[in-house]
Amino acid sequence: MINKAYKAVVLAAVLFALLPWDAAQADDPDFISGGIGYFDWNRQKSPAAEFRAEYRSDYTLWVFKPFGGIMATSEGAFYAYAGLGIDVFLGNRFVITPSIAPGFYAEGGGLDLGYPLEFRSQLEIAYRFDDRSRLGVAISHMSNASIVDENPGTESAILYYSVPLSTLLGR
């Protein structure tokens, strides 16, 4: 089932990449993003508050943008990750961003996901303000993609606020 989910995410990313691109993306900056949400909301085996901090680059590799971040839960779990996302602009205001990121997961006192190497797939929908900052909601799935026998996986629901790095640096 997980392999089918990853194939669906990859297919969706390719289809998004083939969509016509809006000129709004040309001046899109790099971002510092903060997120707060609900970890393991689907299975409720170890539900917790989730906190994220990310750097989202303005550099593009074809249509992919690199990003990296850290996540921590109120139960002591920690995840450090880096990956690629695609910003799909729907006009000047709305952005859909599918992404995938491998990373290192430590359960702490939280949910045991079966292996330190975990993969996070995510779909975010955001509103883009005049200053290019974004307010978005995202659904994430995290699992080890069945590289070991134990692969419980989990989902998160996240509220993001992304600020252009230039705004934070006063440029």
Model-derived regions, located:
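Outer-membrane beta-barrel "beta-signal"
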Residues: A49, P152-R171
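Repeated loop/turn-to-beta-strand initiation elements of outer-membrane beta-barrel proteins
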Residues: D30-I32, T60-K65, N92-I96, D131-V137, ...
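Membrane-embedded beta-strands of outer-membrane beta-barrel proteins
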Residues: F51-Y55, A82-L84, L123, L159
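Transmembrane beta-strand segments that form the barrel wall of outer-membrane beta-barrel proteins
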Residues: F31-D40, V63-S74, I96-A106, V137-S143
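Solvent-exposed loop/turn segments connecting transmembrane beta-strands
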Residues: F39-A49, M71-Y81, G108-P116, S146-T154
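Cleavable N-terminal export/targeting peptides
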Residues: M1-D28, L168-R171
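Mid-chain, well-packed structural core segment of small domains
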Residues: I96-E124
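Residue-level signature of outer-membrane beta-barrel architecture
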Residues: Y55-Y59, I86-V88, Y127, H141, ...
